[in-house]
Amino acid sequence: MRLLIAEDELDLAEALTVFFERNHFTVDAVHNGADAYDYGVSGEYDAIILDMMMPKMNGIQVLERLRAEGVKTPIMMLTAKGQKEDRITGFDAGADDYLPKPFDPDELITRVRAMLRRSQSYQPSLLACGDLTLDPASGLLQCGDTSLRLGGREFQIMELFMRSPRQVFSAEHIMERIWGWDNEAEINVVWVNISNLRKKLKSIGSRVTLRANRGLGYELEDAT
């Protein structure tokens, strides 16, 4: 599940990113309203978390513009303001839920999951390719009666491939999608994670593998 977090408090944004990634979300984090709009209008996200007070454009303005563009992605508003008027303004602008700061991360993720269940765009079904299935909710990778649980970047990479099994992804594209351009990680972390995933696919006896296309990238292949 792909999540956009728009929060101008850098420490909070980083903490939320780590928390959601540990719970099998793929997260992009931005720190101002202009970037929140630019990312959100792409329609690539299953859910968006918007802080009310951000530079360049506040959360309500971002929300109104996204809804005006026809973006139906479920949106959760976060704010230090707890007044009823602010909640009403957010809901009137098209917010799906609202949580005042400070909050418990467990309550936040519970609300996000509930928001996803209510959304028509939410797809809780298993992802499948050949003899392989991946449960996006739990990270369980299974072949026949054998399974293992993926976490962190390995889960995010496998989910990317399982959602587009015939698509070739370059290492650079994987780096951008999973780590983000602002991350200081080196490109070889992609190769390491691909290698680890190949070993895990083999360990559960799957015919499916991550095949390298020389000069192009990697694709998920069912070697039947």
Predicted features by range, described:
Residues 130-140, 216, 224:
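Short boundary/linker motifs that mark transitions into or out of structured domains
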Residues 208-224:
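A short linear beta-strand->loop->alpha-helix hinge motif most characteristic
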Residues 1-119:
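N-terminal/domain-start alpha-helical segments
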Residues 24, 109-112, 136, 178, ...:
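Short amphipathic alpha-helical/adjacent loop interface patches that line ligand
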Residues 140, 145-208, 214:
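Positively charged, aromatic-enriched patches within helix-turn-helix-type DNA-binding elements
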Residues 114-127, 166:
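The C-terminal output helix
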